[in-house]
Design a protein with these regions (language model features):
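N-terminal secretory signal peptides and thylakoid transit peptides that target proteins
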Residues: 1-17
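Extracytoplasmic "Venus flytrap"/periplasmic binding protein-like
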Residues: 32, 55-125, 156-168, 255-257, ...
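Conserved C-terminal helix/tail region of periplasmic/extracytoplasmic solute-binding proteins
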Residues: 34, 66, 83, 159, ...
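Hinge/lid segment of periplasmic solute-binding proteins
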Residues: 97-150, 168, 174, 201, ...
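Short, solvent-exposed loop/beta-turn-alpha elements that line the ligand-binding surface or hinge
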Residues: 112-128, 193, 209-231, 278-292, ...
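Long, aromatic- and glycine/proline-rich binding clefts that accommodate carbohydrate-like moieties
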Residues: 123-132, 290-299, 346-404
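Extracytoplasmic/periplasmic solute-binding protein
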Residues: 136-144, 149, 174-220, 226, ...
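Glycine-centered hinge/linker elements that transmit conformational signals in sensory
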Residues: 176-179, 218-247, 296, 300
Length: 434
């Protein structure tokens, strides 16, 4: 594929957004507005610093409104949006994860006008972006980014146990993990109630065995032979190969464990690798070499029914209770203008993948081959609720961690049959409206 220079890239992508900010004059409606934007604490801190020190001052000048950025732990976003909706006041713009917009759609401003212009100008949104933000009646939120979930692993350690490439199947991964754990280098994975690494592991694992919550028509089919086999395998896999303390981990514990050299692999975004790039003298291998040289990335292994991915998706919802809806929309238009969004995207160094296809051509992807697997994460990921339609019910199942808990219960001693029966019953309650 031919690569674009930055000038050509921005010229091509900006054409479709001409007129979004056609003049340099701030919109008159926004002169006294203050837009309160709440998002997660980025796992690439440099990006939040860029927003605060450079991009938001530029945005305020461009749209004529004050913008207040609040950052919180990603696990706190759902409680905050729920509380704001109940009280009828709070941030004007909420960052949400995955299919969560379907839960709060009744309280969302229709942002079709903003999102459609951005998607059209930037090569079209990936299917996962459309599925998570559109309910068939309106666009609930504006797609922001896809955070690729890949396995970060220590290349040399896997080579020591006979794997010159990352294991292709779950059976191979089990074998490698068992050997690594015997050497004091277990695999690391959370099965806790944390928004990122737990579901992005448990859902693709389930799908790869042929299990799924619902079929194409939305009928609950979780209680199946395929699901049961996945749980049986997980029981032995967990005991033999993983750091069993991972049951209580959040989305930061595995980063710390990997960087301290106590685990050999973990499903994660690229934040571990990016941290070793940022501090090469701090993170060293046992041979006193920069750890960054020994890190590689790979998709999750293949199961009996294929290889799947679930990548953390982010979007921004403008709230109906907001008195600054127009200014909030103008801000989202501004920040998604390619010349502006590119600054943030480049600061992420590949940790976040834009939700539209045009960005696959960006030159940044050629700069570091270790990051190459993340380039097409948005193209390959599925949404929770597969193979059924994305909706409020699938979002509720995700929010309640039912799929993750099914595996967590089994590795803590519940029989596979009981764990599957419990999970299927919980999913059925949600889909039947019980």
């Amino acid at each position: 594929m031919s690569r674009f220079t930055r000038r050509k890239f921005l010229q091509a992508s900006g054409a479709g957004l001409a007129g979004i900010l056609a003049t340099h004059q701030a919109p008159s409606f926004a002169q006294q507005s203050t837009v309160h934007w709440i998002k997660w604490n980025d796992f690439v801190p440099a990006s939040d610093e860029l927003l605060r020190k450079q991009m938001l001052p530029e945005a305020m000048k461009a749209i004529g409104a004050k913008i207040t950025l609040e950052t919180v732990n990603g696990n706190d976003l759902q409680p905050r949006v729920t509380s704001a909706i109940q009280s009828g006041s709070g941030p004007d713009v909420f960052m949400l994860f995955n299919n969560h917009p379907h839960i709060y759609g009744a309280s969302a401003v229709d942002v079709s006008d903003v999102a459609e212009a951005i998607g059209k100008a930037q090569g079209g949104y990936y299917n996962v972006a459309k599925a998570n933000t559109q309910d068939g009646k309106k666009t609930l939120s504006v797609p922001w980014a896809v955070i690729g979930a890949m396995t970060s692993y220590r290349k040399s350690w896997f080579e020591e146990v006979g794997y010159n490439e990352f294991p292709k199947t779950w059976q191979e991964y089990h074998d490698a993990g068992k050997k690594l754990k015997a050497k004091g280098r277990p695999l690391g994975q959370t099965l806790g109630h944390t928004f990122g690494d737990a579901p992005t592991f448990s859902y693709p694992y389930l799908w790869s065995w042929g299990g799924k919550e619902v079929d194409e028509k939305g009928k609950v089919v979780l209680d199946s032979k395929e699901t049961l086999e996945s749980v049986k395998f997980m029981q032995a896999f967990w005991k033999d190969s993983f750091d069993e303390g991972g049951l209580a981990w959040d989305d930061t514990n595995n980063n710390r464990a990997f960087l301290s050299g106590t685990i050999s692999a973990t499903l994660n975004g690229a934040s571990i690798y990016i941290e070793t790039l940022r501090k090469p003298d701090q993170y060293k291998t046992e041979k006193d070499r920069p750890m960054k040289e020994d890190i590689r990335h790979s998709p999750l292994p293949r199961g009996p029914k294929g290889q799947f991915g679930f990548h953390l998706f982010q979007s921004h919802m403008v709230m109906q209770y907001s008195k600054n809806q127009k200014a909030a929309k103008e801000f989202l238009k501004w920040i998604h203008t390619p010349a502006n969004y590119e600054k943030w995207f480049v600061s992420q160094k590949g940790y976040s993948t834009p939700p539209a296809a045009m960005w696959e051509k960006h030159k940044m992807w050629d700069e570091d081959p270790v990051m190459a697997p993340f380039k097409i994460a948005g193209k390959l990921g599925l949404s929770p609720g597969y193979a059924g339609p994305p909706n409020r019910k699938s979002a509720e199942v995700l929010t309640k961690y039912i799929v993750t808990d099914m595996y967590a219960k089994a590795v803590q001693g519940m029989s596979p049959q009981e764990a599957v029966k419990w999970a299927a019953g919980e999913v059925q309650k949600i889909y039947s409206g019980a």
